[in-house]
From Swiss-Prot:
<dbReference type="GO" id="GO:0005506">
    <property type="term" value="F:iron ion binding"/>
</dbReference>
<feature type="binding site">
    <location>
        <position position="800"/>
    </location>
    <ligand>
        <name>Mo-bis(molybdopterin guanine dinucleotide)</name>
    </ligand>
</feature>
<dbReference type="InterPro" id="IPR041957">
    <property type="entry name" value="CT_Nitrate-R-NapA-like"/>
</dbReference>
<dbReference type="GO" id="GO:0009325">
    <property type="term" value="C:nitrate reductase complex"/>
</dbReference>
<feature type="domain" description="4Fe-4S Mo/W bis-MGD-type">
    <location>
        <begin position="37"/>
        <end position="93"/>
    </location>
</feature>
<dbReference type="InterPro" id="IPR006657">
    <property type="entry name" value="MoPterin_dinucl-bd_dom"/>
</dbReference>
<keyword id="KW-0249">Electron transport</keyword>
<keyword id="KW-0004">4Fe-4S</keyword>
<dbReference type="InterPro" id="IPR006311">
    <property type="entry name" value="TAT_signal"/>
</dbReference>
<dbReference type="GO" id="GO:0009055">
    <property type="term" value="F:electron transfer activity"/>
</dbReference>
<keyword id="KW-0813">Transport</keyword>
<comment type="similarity">
    <text>Belongs to the prokaryotic molybdopterin-containing oxidoreductase family. NasA/NapA/NarB subfamily.</text>
</comment>
<dbReference type="GO" id="GO:0042128">
    <property type="term" value="P:nitrate assimilation"/>
</dbReference>
<dbReference type="InterPro" id="IPR010051">
    <property type="entry name" value="Periplasm_NO3_reductase_lsu"/>
</dbReference>
<dbReference type="GO" id="GO:0050140">
    <property type="term" value="F:nitrate reductase (cytochrome) activity"/>
</dbReference>
<feature type="binding site">
    <location>
        <position position="556"/>
    </location>
    <ligand>
        <name>Mo-bis(molybdopterin guanine dinucleotide)</name>
    </ligand>
</feature>
<feature type="binding site">
    <location>
        <begin position="210"/>
        <end position="217"/>
    </location>
    <ligand>
        <name>Mo-bis(molybdopterin guanine dinucleotide)</name>
    </ligand>
</feature>
């Protein structure tokens, strides 16, 4: 029997599915069994790598999955989470009907959850929305969205809120993970997202990881780095972190530094480049300009907090014109001696790192994730790494550049590109720019002035506004913020449970968030709907619906579009707007936003033969194509070009900008980027002068440090087996068994000093709350003395009852990596 590589992989998947079900299939029957399974492509539901998978369905269920051998990203590989994708949808507690807190048949905030119809749920929601609008205006209602939503779900949320409700109170959970990176991209280059791609891995001479445990968080990319390192003895890997983790196993240089001092380390590197004449002056003079950042900018806490007094919080994001000489003066104090004392790194470690960046013959890729972004100076550290690459000219060329890795499957595609933030519109447009608002109103066919110029509330501000009674309704979709967000006990939970407030959670499972809400809406997930994600390398990937959702569960897209029918323009818009377009009087928001002659212009006949598509069948037109083509109009011709819709179903994803059917691997470089003209060489065309910004900023301390009472640093993060709050992975028996509960990792000598031993039940406390857990002094994570590490996947151990809601004042992203705690034996 002759089998192609693809058929062989599918046969393996069929065998794996049978094994998981406890069955045995004779070898001769494997291919026959595979022939009974229907296969189609999809994208992994987990991290931002964007691995492509083959999904096998039979009898209306997903029964197998396999890494797609034809995919450029993962080349047939999956990580351990990816291999168990079929099981994420079939947890025993899957939600199948709307649930509302009720007593005697009526809504009661303190009542028990009871099943209701979708119409009853939406009528209740609409009543609460309208009450809130009447009480506190357009900003009384908020949406907390997700980098896990599909592109069209994110676009529909944005459109319903910003055009329909005329409120910019939309924020994604990417606020917790990618906001600092996005803001730094915009400030440095005038455009968001990385200039390079994963192809850099096979061409780089050195990799430097800053606050990134790629071995566990991006294991498929790590496998490619490992292959590059092992295949070429001259390639080097450097890992910087505040504790030792599995990525250190491959590292040639493992550097453990004191929290927050990455700011000082990078300023030392810049100082080294200057002192050793390692500046690429030709590049710097042609392609960069110098700015100085505002300092003493605070920590994003409530205004009355002592740390916010006498700060420049109001002008935190301001950048002042500057010069190379001013940068040179600022970094001159960051000597190797001073930074060694600050960071805990020895002089040789620091100099070796600086020499790597200084060597003009070495191609260097810098990777980072949450260690940089979840930081009270996250925008600064992002911009400092850009400084290093810009000063050396090591940017926008194969094998060389700074690369921000994303943690969610569409943090780029849905949160950032779609503009699902309270200050953004699609394709890097912003609500504060009149021309950008006019563009949105033109594309959306709206009266002038519909889109508000007022920036909405970010998620931490939403928490505080709910707690203060200034925002009264919150709809949370596709995330679990009651478990994942900071300072649960003091801000979020009191606001959600406050009398007069109403919280809706759309989710497939009864998460901590869902059980804290007033209304739970059961949601279709992954291949139960047609989808699109945008990964970390600007690659947009599509998949088709392959099975139906259970019971009455509906996709978030259906929920948004159907809910729009419960509001009219007369209720939501001003007389001035209706006078401009009287044809919209009395129309529902659904009719104006979604059945507008653009979104609804593609008939059902354009669906592939036999293709499932519940939303399109319900609404009577190819919803996803209409939404995508309208959305794509924002970016085409402006450096954010997306390909025509149909191309994506044929390809394994395309990296934008896609011009004349050709994707772009390296942006801003002549010969690779169609927006760089002949003879320009490099053009950072996000700015009119096509120059990137080199920003001078100093070290500033964290919001909270250990003291006599709370004597340890706490850093939070993840482990390989689980993803975020474990909503999906803890319902996969194999993953749950592999890592059933959260732990707290501590240095053995710190444990000994407290009379603790490995395996002890402990209580970890901060100024905000406490958590009971178990101690690990021998495991995969090895903190230095003075620091403990824990995860947040375990709903039975709410690690974010400990964390501080301090944020970067520019990006508003929370610092989950640094707060002060104490650890003692539990009673």
């Amino acid at each position: 029997m002759n089998l192609s590589r693809r058929d062989f992989m599918k046969a393996n998947a069929a065998m794996a599915a049978a094994t998981a079900a406890g069955l045995t299939i004779p070898v001769k029957n494997v291919v026959a069994a595979e022939s009974e399974i229907k296969w189609d492509k999809a994208v992994c539901r987990f991290c931002g790598t964007g691995c492509a998978v083959l999904v096998g369905t039979k009898d209306g269920r997903v029964v197998a999955s396999q890494g797609d051998p034809d995919a450029e990203v993962n080349r047939g590989l999956n990580c351990i989470k990816g291999y168990f994708l079929p099981k994420i949808m079939y947890g025993k507690d899957r939600l199948t009907q709307p649930l509302l807190r009720m007593t005697n048949g009526k809504f009661d905030k303190n009542g028990d959850f009871a099943p209701v119809s979708w119409d009853f749920a939406f009528k209740t929601m609409a009543e609460k929305f309208k009450e809130a609008f009447k009480k506190n205006g357009q900003n009384a209602v908020g949406m907390f969205s997700s980098g896990q939503s599909t592109i069209w779900e994110g676009y529909a949320k944005n459109k319903l809120w910003k055009a329909g409700f005329r409120s910019n109170n939309v924020d994604p959970n990417a606020r917790h993970c990618m906001a600092s990176a996005a803001v730094a991209f915009m400030r440095t280059f005038g455009m968001d997202e990385p200039m390079g791609c994963y192809d850099d891995i096979e061409q780089a001479d050195a990799f430097v990881l800053w606050g990134s445990n790629m071995a566990e968080m991006h294991p498929i990319l790590w496998s490619r780095i490992t292959d590059r390192r092992i295949s070429n003895p001259d390639v080097r890997v450097t890992v910087l972190s505040t504790y030792e983790h599995r990525s250190f196993e491959l590292a040639d240089h493992g550097l453990i530094f004191t929290p927050q001092t990455d700011l000082a380390i990078m300023n030392y590197i810049i100082n080294y480049l200057i002192q050793n004449n390692a500046i690429n002056w030709d590049f710097v003079n042609k392609h960069t300009k110098f700015k100085r950042g505002e300092t003493n900018i605070g920590y994003g806490l409530r205004p009355e907090h002592p740390l916010e007094k006498d700060t420049n919080r109001a002008t935190a994001g301001k950048m002042h014109d500057s010069s190379f000489e001013e940068l040179k003066q600022l970094v001159s104090e960051y000597t190797v001696e001073k930074v060694s004392k600050m960071s805990g790194l020895d002089k040789v470690q620091l100099e070796t790192l600086a020499k790597l960046y200084a060597d003009p013959t070495k191609k260097v890729v810098s990777y980072w994730t949450m260690g940089f972004n979840q930081h009270t100076r996250g925008v600064w550290v992002n911009q400092l790494i850009y400084n290093i690459h810009l000063l050396t000219g090591k940017i926008s060329i194969p094998g060389c550049g700074p690369f921000s890795l994303t943690g969610q499957p569409s943090a780029c595609g849905t949160a950032r590109e779609v503009g699902s933030f309270p200050h953004r519109l699609p394709a890097d447009l912003v609500v504060t720019n009149p021309k950008h608002r006019e563009t949105a109103e033109r594309i959306w066919k709206l009266p002038k002035g519909t889109v508000s110029e007022k920036v909405g509330l970010h998620t931490i501000a939403q928490d505080r506004a709910m707690n203060d009674g200034e925002m009264n309704v919150l709809w949370q979709m596709c995330n679990n913020n009651m478990q994942a967000g900071p300072n649960i006990n003091q801000e979020r939970l009191p606001g959600w449970r406050k009398e007069g407030n109403f919280v809706i959670v759309s989710d497939p499972y009864p998460t901590v968030s869902a059980l804290s809400a007033d209304l739970i809406l059961p949601t279709a997930m992954w291949v139960e709907k047609e989808g699109a994600y945008g990964n970390a390398e600007r690659r947009t990937q599509f998949w088709r619906q392959q099975v139906k959702a259970p019971g009455e569960a509906k996709s978030d897209l259906w929920q948004l579009m159907e809910f729009a029918k419960y509001f009219t323009t007369d209720e939501m818009w001003t007389e001035d707007l209706l006078t401009q377009m009287p044809e919209y009087r009395g129309k529902t928001l659904y009719e104006v936003l979604f059945k507008n002659g653009q979104v609804d212009k593609f008939p059902l006949s354009e669906l592939a033969e036999g293709q499932l598509n519940d939303e399109s069948e319900y609404f009577g037109y190819y919803v996803h194509k209409g939404l995508f083509e309208e959305y794509a109009e924002f970016g085409r011709g402006h450096g954010h070009d997306l390909a025509p819709f149909d191309m994506y179903h044929k390809a394994h994803g395309l990296r934008w900008p896609v011009v004349e059917g050709k994707e772009t691997l390296w942006r801003y470089r002549e010969g690779y980027d169609p927006y760089v003209k002949e003879g320009e060489g490099v053009a950072f065309y996000g700015y009119p002068d096509k120059k990137a910004i080199i920003l001078a900023v100093p070290y500033e301390p964290p919001a909270e440090s250990p003291d006599n009472e709370y004597d340890l640093w706490l850093s939070t993060g993840r482990v390989l087996e689980h993803w975020h709050t474990g909503t999906m992975t803890r319902r996969v028996p194999e993953l749950h068994r592999a890592f059933p509960n959260n732990l707290v990792w501590m240095h053995p000598l710190d444990a000994q000093a407290r009379g603790l031993r490995h395996g002890d039940k402990i209580k970890i406390s901060s100024r905000r709350g406490e958590m009971i857990s178990y101690l690990d002094t021998r495991g995969r994570n090895k903190p230095p003395r003075g620091l403990v590490f824990t995860t947040f996947f375990d709903a039975g151990q709410l690690a974010n009852s400990l964390t501080l809601d301090a944020t970067d004042p520019i990006s508003k992203e929370t610092d989950f990596k640094k707060c002060a705690v104490k650890v003692e034996k539990a009673a």
